[in-house]
Amino acid sequence: MLPGNTFKPIPSFASLREPDRVSKNLDEIDLKILAEIQADGRITNVELAKRVGISPPPCLRGVRTLEEEGYIQGYRGLLDPRRLGFDVTVFASVHLSSQAEADLRAFEAFVRAEPLVRECWMLSGEVDFILKCVAPDMATFQDFVTHLTAAPHVRNVRTSLVLHNSKYEAAVPLDLKAVG
């Protein structure tokens, strides 16, 4: 792991609507650094510098700048939920009875406190939020759904059990950024 790395939390949904999130022009070195770190978050600075084609000190400065500017939000290990006993993955579509800003924030706070919810996305259209949830078994998930449907302003919840994951790619397609 690179020295000086710290986890930076992902911003709330409300902050994603702020206009100051415009991407700076990333140069070729920035994109190479991001691609290498995205492929291997445990890469050493010396190895990263070699792969990117620069010396270690400017490489480390580049990584720190990308961290400070929020391009690198943190470093995590990818774990296998099934091997850890989380055999059930479900997507839950949540419809709220109110879309007032305070109610949306309250729902987001509710979801952040729920350990079975691994991702929460606010959507436009027929569904207000979609949640990706994991559970050790269906009984545990059903208890969570009962709890979720009782939350303030939740009008209804529809769930879809994952049968098979055909693709999981956490990486951002940087090759498209380089072309565009």
Q: Regions from the language model: what does each represent?
A:
Residues 1-180:
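A compositional/biophysical signature of low hydrophobicity enriched in polar/charged and small residues
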